[in-house]
Amino acid sequence: MGGDSGTGAAAAVRLAEGAALREAVGTADPAAWAALDAGVREIAPDQDAYRWLPAWERTEAGRALAEALTGGSDARPLAEGWLALGLCHRQGRIRAAALQRAAARPELLPLMVVRCSDWAPPVREDARRLLAEVLDAESAVRLMALILRIGRRDRGEFVTDLATRLLRAAPRDTLAPLYTDADRTVRRYAYRLAVEEGHLSPAELARAAARDTDTVIQSRCADAALAGLAQRDASGQAGLASGAVAGRDAYDDVLEPLLGARGAQARAAGVTALRRAGRSGRAAGFLGDRAAVVRACARYVLRQAGGDPLAWYRERCAAGGPALPAGAVSGLAECGERADAELLWALTSHAVAAVRARAVAGLRALDVTDVARMRELLDDPAPGVVREAALALLPCARMLDERWLMRRLATERPRQVRVSAFLLLNAHEGLVRLRAAVALIDDPDDRLRYRARQSVQRWRPTADVPRGSAEVGELLDRARLLDPYTVHRRKWEAGIKV
């Protein structure tokens, strides 16, 4: 079942008709429980009886549920589906009655978690008291995604605090399933708790930082791993300064996973730690990293050791060759000078498209723009190079011949050529911009068509538009995107008689 109240209302009808809870609700999905909770109370008009009631309450079972739940101690046992409906009922007395029966039904524990943030104080207090009696650490792990979801609600902090207390007191391995949960919010919670409680060694934290795809987890685990190493050094356990083998092994166990991680945050932390480990020379291997943050950390480490990253970049870029990493080109632009522009210009004809694109981006970063030379790069076969060249030319777009740019909008041109041409034409004002936008309002390319239509709708006549220009009126009429009043207003602003 999905996570909206409409599907929750449909599930409520199925439960009222006798369907099993697992059949009507995706019990493993926290969004499904939240949807059921809202869907049970979703009101729809009853045109026959002229009443507004949830759809499930119009069934025979729905009409009998209230009496069954409030019928006293001798009331007959209810199926889990009916109890689920009672736990989400719009009337607080029925929710409260359902809570007392649900406490002994583990399959209804998720709805007891939901009721801990109930808007009615008596129901909320009963739910919290009962949940504190039945929830254990294993159940908290199983329901953690739902617990964190409810914890973000008003009055929802109780469930997260309860789960945290249970997990802090549980054995360290209890958290293990949460480290690989599909929900990154759950993983963040688990690693934060593990770091606070010291459940993971520096090596385990480093492997987690290298493995996880979430940048928050990468940073948290990498920082904690390195902090753990520093603490060991301070307490004399690692013995790195004295050259102890145990200390070297400890750093290897932490640094190698970090340096080989896919995530930039983890690699950056590992590179920065090379200085403390006395291995600053290894940072040179990361000067050409694909991530800017890793390159910056590598430059810092080398400079602290007396190295010259700029000389390394100049040497590598001057040598060129197919093995030149694209990150080295970006690194030259990041710490180079305008005098390095010729090295970058030479790389705009490199055989590797990524190197050419980084070279063009580097020229833009150094604020070096030769319009004639940059214009030639608009015909590069690589879309990335064309995109970077267009961005570099954007500040001086009005220096380009608009008729030449208009011809590049033709549908037979490669897409990157058409996109770059429209980007540069749209940087103009007045008639040039309006002509380009109207030319593409029915373009087969969805994104180009959308951008063109947005440009038409935002167009205003500027000082360079001749007053009373008939072409403006014709273009606005062709666009067919504006209501009559707006067209009339634009024409009046352009000095056209209407």
Question: Where in the sequence are the language-model features?
Answer:
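Long, acidic/serine-threonine-rich intrinsically disordered regions with weak helical/coil propensity
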Residues: 1-62, 337, 386, 433
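N-terminal segments that cap or nucleate solenoid repeat domains
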Residues: 3, 7-24, 32, 75-101, ...
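Alpha-solenoid HEAT/Armadillo-like helical repeat scaffolds in large eukaryotic proteins
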Residues: 82-87, 111-119, 143-153, 174-180, ...
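HEAT/HEAT-like alpha-solenoid repeats
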Residues: 76, 107-109, 122, 142-154, ...
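Structural detector for internal amphipathic alpha-helices that build alpha-solenoid repeat scaffolds
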Residues: 51-74, 85, 95-104, 114, ...
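Intrinsically disordered terminal tails
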Residues: 430-432, 442-451, 457-498
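Gly/Ser/Thr-rich loops at beta-strand to alpha-helix junctions
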Residues: 92, 119-121, 184
